[in-house]
Every structure is written in C-alpha cells, then in structure tokens.
Amino acid sequence: MIAVGSDISQKTIDVQILDENETYIKIQNNEIGFNKLLKKLSDNPCNYHFCMEATGNYYENFADFLVENGFQVTVANPLKISKFAETEFQKTKTDKQDCKLIAQYCQEKLLKKHGTYKKPTEQQYQVKRLLSYINQLKQQKTALMNRQKSCKDEFIEIELKKQLVELKAHIKTAESKLSELTKSEEKDRLKTIPAISETTARVLVHFLTMFDFKTANKFTAFAGLSPQQRKSGTSVNKKEKLSRYGNRILKTALYMPAVVAYRMGVFKKMTDRLEKKGKSGKVVIVAIMRKLAVLAFNLYTKGQVYDIRKFG
C-alpha cells in the first residue's frame, strides 16, 4: 500500500505520494482539485492510504471525497505528527515538507496499525459546527462582560448591555437547536456523572460518536488531557503542565465540571492524594478533567450509568 500525506489549508492542499517517483502535487481545496488528484492516481484506490491532520474543518470535504471514492483515510491528531517530526529532527517547515512528513508518518506508523476515517453523517457535522458556534458566542460573551466591568462611560455601558442581551439570546437559540439534534440515551447516561451538565454531556457524546476511540487514553489524548513533564537529571525539572494540543471545545467543556466537582468534594480520595504530593490546584483540576473524560468513555462504551461504588 502506498502512503499519501496531505497538508491542508483553506484554499490549497499539498499532496505527497510515496510511490517510486515520490510524486508531489498541489491542488485546490475544492472539487476541481479533488478530481485533478483522482486522475493522477490511476491505480486502484485500495492501493493508497491517505493521512492528514485534524485541523479546523478544512480537511472535511477532502476526507469525505476520498472515502466516497474508495480510498483509506486517517485523520491524525496533530500532536502525533508533531512528535513524529521531532523524532525525524525536522526543522524546515514548508507546506511541501509538511505533507512529506505526514506521508512518512503514515508509512511508518499507520500502515502497521491504523484507524481509518469514516465519513460523519450530516447531523454529526451539524452538531460539530453548532458546538463551535456556541463556543465562539460564549467567548464573545465573556469578552463583553469583562469590557462591561471596566467600562467608565455610561453610554458605552448601556450599548454593551444591549449586545450582551442579544448574545445570550443567540446562545439560547443555538443550544435549543443543539438539544434537538442530540437527544439520546447515551447523553442521559453521561449526565449521571457528578457535575456533568446537559451541555457537557452533549459535547462528550458528540465526540465519542463521531470518532472511533479504541481506548480511554486515546480519548483523553484527543482532548489534550495528557499531562506533560520535562525532567532530565538535575538540569531540567519543569512543572507538569497541560498539553497545549487537543480539541479546544472538548477541553473547555470539561473545565467547569471539573471545578464544580472539586468544590463538591467529588473524587476526594484522588484530590487528597494529589494535594498531599504538593500538586497545585491547576494540576488537580486537570486530573479531575481527565477522570471525567475517562468515566464518560467507559459509560458510553459499556452502556452503563455512573455508580460511585464502581467508579469512585
């Protein structure tokens, strides 16, 4: 099987095919470009395995087109590609170099053991975009509230209040639409986890449904909840920190439930143990976020409800 790496931007796609000639082609990120590539690949689609990074939503149409035409596709976590680049000592960063690196990653890692991409349903895409839209609205709301607190002009303060009312109405409408699309038994089961709200349960079910996570560790890595620590001899000993990678929407959705769970004293044995080790409040919150994600994965995959005797 031939590995193919794709570096995708809003308007173009750089494609590196690891065939005998190491063919490189740049195409438009639209159907015209996709068909141009299809003509270039004269062999049976089963002979190719495409790999691309899960960045934004620029990859979606291309990945769907490939699957519809019989190609195998993997949408990889950018963190894995980044780590692979480090092992290859790659320092040059160009679109052409990036797509070749992704192809090499596909060849060395994925062809041995890979998880292929399945085209999401139209409803899953709609939920994904609604979640992103709601997240953006909430960020705008926070920014407006901060401006309102520091505002010293009466006229501007009144205008900000009006904008805030409108924004809250937009959020309510979007969440109502999201609720229509995400009615499910899975969501109700996840709501049995302490501190998991309706909104958070929707987000969790969406990602657990849309991506085929084989293990809880893969789900937490996707969320960016794998702590990183740099420690080597006595020269490097930095504080443990949360990975800057991971899905921002999922990570954001788990943050407030973790704070609430901490205040409620949920998972007290775990938090007491971490605090005795001198871990900071931030590290404890991240540990709870990870615990919630693992619980969600287990309840979702096993079809169970939360039981404190079983899950702690």
Task: Annotate the PLM regions.
Residues 51-61:
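Acidic, metal-coordinating catalytic cores used for nucleic-acid/nucleotide bond scission
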Residues 10, 56, 80:
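Short, glycine/acidic-enriched loop or turn micro-motifs at the edges of active sites
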Residues 1-18, 102:
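Gly/Thr-rich phosphate-binding beta-strand-loop-beta motif of the actin/hexokinase/Hsp70
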Residues 198, 204-277, 281:
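Phosphate-backbone recognition surface of nucleic-acid-processing proteins
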Residues 1-3, 47-50:
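Short active-site oxyanion
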Residues 78-189, 193:
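Long, charge-rich intrinsically disordered scaffolds of nucleic-acid metabolism proteins
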Residues 234-235, 271-312:
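Low-complexity, acidic/Ser/Thr- and charged residue-rich accessory regions of DNA metabolism proteins
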Residues 21-49:
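Nucleic-acid-processing active sites and adjacent nucleic-acid-binding tracks
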